[in-house]
Design a protein with these regions (language model features):
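Alpha/beta-hydrolase fold catalytic core
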Residues: 1-26, 46-50, 87-88
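Active-site glycine-rich loops that stabilize anionic/oxyanionic intermediates
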Residues: 21-22, 30-33, 96
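The serine-hydrolase catalytic nucleophile loop
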Residues: 30-42
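Alpha/beta-hydrolase active-site loop signature
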Residues: 32, 56-60, 123
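Active-site loop/oxyanion-hole signature of alpha/beta-hydrolase fold enzymes
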Residues: 39-44, 52-94
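Flexible "cap/lid" loop of the alpha/beta hydrolase fold
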Residues: 100-108, 112-143, 147-150
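Alpha/beta-hydrolase
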Residues: 159-161
């Protein structure tokens, strides 16, 4: 596995690039997670080309967001990372918030998203839901990603589960 830390790049994004070949698969994690969520999928996917996993701004080992976080900002982060790594086009897969970023990226840069996969990602949320997410982002920025775990467990594993 080849690991690169891109602190020297223009956008301060931490990433791992694994495998080789002409095709690239990019994996985007969800809110409060980091690139390591893909550690079990990366080896299998690397059989098909290079696999790029990275930490979103404010997550893992990446820099804090350069502006107020939003889908357009995260879309630009990915475009800048692809530019820095000379990746013209890729298959892009995102989980939860990562899926929302994939959709935004495909709208912003349609020629760069060869194929998209959206996993367990919400669509057309209400303003109240957006506000709740933004509060979780701020909580994770202030107190670290572990601060959102208890709330996530309550949401995901209800009594009915």
């Amino acid at each position: 596995m080849t690991i690169f830390n891109s602190n020297g790049t223009s956008n301060g994004t931490y990433y791992q690039l694994t495998g080789s070949g002409k095709s690239t698969i990019i994996l985007i994690h969800g809110l409060g997670l980091n690139h390591q969520m893909w550690q079990h999928q990366t080896p299998a996917l690397a059989a098909y080309g290079q696999v790029l996993c990275y930490d979103l701004y404010g997550h893992g080992q990446s820099s804090p967001p350069p502006e107020k976080p939003g889908l357009s900002m995260f879309s630009r982060q990915l475009a800048e990372l692809m530019d820095a790594l000379n990746i013209k086009q890729a298959t892009i897969m995102g989980f939860s918030l990562g899926g929302m970023i994939v959709r935004r990226f495909a709208m912003d840069y349609p020629d760069r998203a060869e194929t998209i996969a959206i996993l367990h990602s919400p669509h057309q949320r209400t303003q109240a839901a957006h506000d709740h997410i933004q509060n979780r982002v701020y909580q994770a920025q202030k107190d670290g990603p572990d601060a959102t775990v208890e709330d996530a467990l309550i949401r995901w594993f209800t009594d009915a589960f």
